[in-house]
């Protein structure tokens, strides 16, 4: 079984392993020559006659996304289909709340300007609405309710500074745009809309999972674990559960234009392993628990409480140091689908059993840490934080 969870807020014993990677086609891979460019969308937003009602629309959407556990973002998909709704909201929310939503201004502008160019307006609008492009509004909670935004875009080259367009309306109602230099310091002082690409809308946050299934718990000190069918148990030995209590990011992994950092915490193991023969061993499939954790930029250096189950059905054997799991932390940067092929092992009744584990990742991901961990290490560490590269994790071993 594979549990894939997205959590938003928002070292160890290392065994050298030579990873093997196999490429897979990725249908969601972004075409580098995308029909709709980030810079183009930023220019459109700077040219259309935005007023306070449109500001409130975007602010409501990014606030809703943040409340649903995502970053402060307003996707083009939501902007065109359900104005004012955030990531995680119902598709029908907000459709009648805005008599002249932002999408109408964008459509009017595109039809009036691109009809004269060698580009079909309908095709452009369709491509924009179906793209991964979004408006990211950092520090949106500081908006005073009236200041117009500076519009910029992610240069996607690692830069921390870019050109932006400041929207101003004079006392006589005359509207004009001035070109400015935008950095994160400016974004903390005045409203800045960053046109960038979404990378988290395809996953459910812990907040969304709690709403959909009360059995997941209510947060705080509760353990978040999906209800499961009864599992095989042994009469001898204790059965333990590994819980990831806290996660702390010690530096931002992406430029501020890209928004939050998305981490995948992956652990591969054999659950409730009781095989006594090679034939029985073939009946077991490795489990891969895969958490996506999104940490906002203002949460760097701050411990985030998760209380998420990583590994269940863990029985102590005669030699706990012989029981190993495969563990990896990556920071998502996209690319083609690959996998980390490695080995882990369990020790039962005096015998050591090795098994293959394939853990998925993307080709451009930053590998924060990967390796093999023995179960005894978790027992010895229990409750104390451990460093894994530039992140810090706190585990707890629970006996159930």
Regions flagged by a language model, labelled:
Residues 34-238:
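Long, charge-dense tracts
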Residues 332-400:
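C2-type phospholipid-binding modules
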Residues 274-318:
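Tryptophan-paired
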Residues 3-4, 11, 15-48, 52:
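Bacterial Sec-dependent N-terminal signal peptides
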Residues 261-263:
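Short beta-strand/loop motifs in extracellular/secreted proteins, especially
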Residues 265, 299-349:
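Eukaryotic beta-sheet cores, primarily in C2 and C2-like/PH beta-sandwich modules
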Residues 234-258:
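Short amphipathic, basic-aromatic surface patches that mediate peripheral association
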